[in-house]
Amino acid sequence: ARSIESCMKLKVPTLAIIIGEGGSGGAIALASSSKVIMLENAIYSVISPEGCATILWRDPKKMLDAAKAMKLSAKDLIELEIIDEIINEPLGGAHRDKNLVLENVKMSISKNLEEFKTMTPEEIYNNRKNKFLRIGRNKGFINNLDELSSLKYKKNNFDQIRKLKKIII
């Protein structure tokens, strides 16, 4: 949570590049980057398919069903607007031609950083914050995209929560 908070406060661009398996709480932290980029065959989710299958069906063997439902592939995630770009890999995967993949990653970094050159620090900060807030509220998750304009940040009042908890106990 602290790494997400720290990243969200930055007024410089940040890039997250997922090259293999981005999972667990670290996946959430990566989502707080200005741009999230994935290799074509990488996967990205807040839980592993095995973990999801165990929770939903109490059977880790149903991991293929879970993986399909989770939409954790680069292709699925770009359609859901969770990630910003897919970096192509050679047929058979990145390990088949490491130099080509490294060149593709280099070009992606350069291209994405170029987008921020004309932005003020405040614009970079606001773009990152709004992008993060849209996750789960964009196409594929909600029906009315017009509601996105009404997103508001509201600070929790922990004193009121503590008082309420005392009443319940």
Question: Where are the language model's segments positioned?
Answer:
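Intrinsically disordered, low-complexity segments enriched in small/flexible residues
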Residues: N99-I169
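Conserved catalytic cores of soluble enzyme domains
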Residues: A1-S110, E114, T118
